[in-house]
């Protein structure tokens, strides 16, 4: 009787896990698509116009001149 009860509980957990993972799979796919779109955004090269929301390529946005610049190292 104990073996049957354990098997029944294991089967219930497996079906519950499978059902809930189906609903979450859609969200995971959307999340990975969003992540991929963020990863493929292009950065702005040196000398191009920028603002506080622009991503400059290994550079920084000089808000005074509003262009991407390479940082000056001493």
From Swiss-Prot:
Expressed by the venom duct. GO terms for molecular function: ion channel inhibitor activity; toxin activity. Keywords: Cleavage on pair of basic residues, Disulfide bond, Knottin, Secreted, Signal, Toxin. Disulfide bonds join 43-57, 50-61, 56-68. It is found in: Secreted. Residues 18-40 form a propeptide. Residues 19-42 are annotated as: Disordered. Residues 1-17 form the signal peptide. GO terms for cellular component: extracellular region. Pfam families: Conotoxin. The presence of a 'disulfide through disulfide knot' structurally defines this protein as a knottin. This is Conotoxin AbVIJ. It comes from Conus abbreviatus.
């Amino acid at each position: 009787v104990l073996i049957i009860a354990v098997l029944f509980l294991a089967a219930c957990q497996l079906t519950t896990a499978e059902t809930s993972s189906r609903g979450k799979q859609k969200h995971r796919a959307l999340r990975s698509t969003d992540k991929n779109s963020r990863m493929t955004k292009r950065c702005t090269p040196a000398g191009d116009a920028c603002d506080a929301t622009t991503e400059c390529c290994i550079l920084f946005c000089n808000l005074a001149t509003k262009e991407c610049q390479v940082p000056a190292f001493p």
